[in-house]
Amino acid sequence: MERDSFLVAGAQTAFVDASVASDERYRPSLITNSQVDGCSLLSVLKREFSSCSSFDLCVAFIADTGLQPLVQVLSSLRQRGVKGRILTSTYLNFNRPEVFAKLLEYENIDVRVYQGSMHAKGYMFKQGDVSTVIIGSSNLTQTALTCNREWNVLFRSYETGDMLASVRSEFEELWASSDTVQLSKAWIEEYREYRKTHQVKSAPNKKTFVSNAVEALGTDDVICPNKMQSMALEALK
């Protein structure tokens, strides 16, 4: 019951009256990587990973630079047997095969790939009867986690909360989608070959990769940026 009051007070401070006293740990907040408050999304993710009992991530783009700062905490989760799920994508064929291979090294993490235009960025951490959710603009890239000015909203909820239920429902729908495949070594090799043959420097690939082993339903062409636009997009992530 005491924790109920913490969540209610936190919501009042965030959405009703900023002068209401509340525990900052239960208060919805905006994470921007601002140097003023010294709070980066990377530091928040490390904290949540370290204290969670399970986690679900839905992130379109994952780069080596985004995984590397999390290696230590992810290895700790593996040693502790903490289970997690990561749903990523082949959108714009941004993710490198090496990143997928790295994710496969964590046997405690179930990884699936949505083969289509999925651009979500959401992080869910469960700790007891309370979950922490972060939804916003940051993919798992170094700049998006540390120095880019991003907008990521963090909130906490009981499992019975409506907002959390909506987020989990969307995650489960994408997780079970016919456009989603289980990450495997065979899939990674197929994806690697696809990128080699389709990503021509002078003419960017206009189709998102879809494994030949999976029948894709309603997969349409997506607009791809040119080389200079791609470099600009990477700098923004």
Q: What feature does the model see in each segment?
A:
Residues 1-235:
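PLD/PLD-like phosphodiesterase catalytic module centered on the HKD motif
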